[in-house]
Design a protein with these regions (language model features):
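Class I S-adenosyl-L-methionine-dependent methyltransferase catalytic core
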Residues: 1-250
Length: 250
């Protein structure tokens, strides 16, 4: 997200101490709201008791990065929308998980799918790109009393190794990124491995070559496309229609 010059000025004039950031002076309401949006996107949260914004880490480091680049990453820029619990349960059921299976979650977010798979008794390797999500993910795993491998990297840059029994995922959708992520994820499965993924409903009706080839792949891998109810991700901040795709490697 690009940041306007007046908000950059506000951040430049702010004072920091440890994980605390205090804005200087009395800001016009609209300007404050825009500055607050940027601070929250950088993981700063208003603390009423402290009367300042508090960050998970060093506030100066977070603000300096924003000022230097003139932008801040928000989760939705990377297509991150948390998976609602009812859909997590459906994914786990479709994956036919049993204890001891080795599972890959390529867009692990903040751990909704990972923790559920760990509770089944699976061994889970997680990939996540956003630092804020990685912090939340590792915290969720630890709080649930489990261990899992977490790697902060762009999943599409990882060379595939066929070592997983299952892949369970909710990838980004923008510009048909979900197809690219699922195609790459299939390369990580052992023979007879199962992939289940939330995807955009566009895979059911779009007619471009990428979509046609993907539907052929679903058919070739004993797959199915299961429509989800409209508004399934409303609580996560999007009304995009979604499906679950299941495939079995042969």
């Amino acid at each position: 997200m690009k940041i306007s010059n007046d908000v950059l000025d506000v951040l430049s004039n702010a004072t920091t101490s440890g994980n605390a950031l205090s804005l200087s002076g009395q800001l016009e309401r609209g300007l404050y709201q825009r500055a607050n949006k940027v601070i929250e996107a950088a993981s700063g949260k208003w603390n009423r008791k402290a009367q300042c914004h508090l960050f998970d880490g060093d506030a100066a480091d977070a603000v300096d990065q924003i000022i230097l680049t003139g932008e801040v990453t928000v989760k939705q820029d990377f297509g991150y929308f948390p998976t609602p619990e009812v859909i997590v349960d459906q994914l786990i059921d479709l994956a036919e998980l049993i204890p001891g299976m080795h599972v890959l979650e390529p867009s692990a977010g903040q751990g909704a799918i990972t923790v559920k798979a760990l509770r089944v008794g699976a061994r889970v390797d997680c990939v996540e790109l956003l630092p804020e999500n990685v912090r939340a993910l590792t915290g969720a795993i630890a709080s649930a009393g489990f261990n899992a491998t977490v790697e902060m990297i762009d999943f599409l840059t990882i060379p595939p190794v066929q070592c997983y029994d299952r892949v369970i995922m909710n990838p980004p959708f923008a510009r048909q990124a979900d197809i690219h992520h699922v195609n790459h994820a299939m390369k990580f499965l052992k023979p007879d491995g199962i992939l289940v993924s939330v995807m955009s409903a566009g895979v059911m009706f779009r007619t471009n070559r990428l979509t046609i080839d993907f539907k052929n792949k679903v058919d070739a891998n004993d797959g199915e496309i299961i429509p989800l109810p409209e508004g399934s991700f409303r609580e996560s901040g999007t009304m995009v229609n979604t499906v679950i795709v299941k495939m079995v490697t042969r």
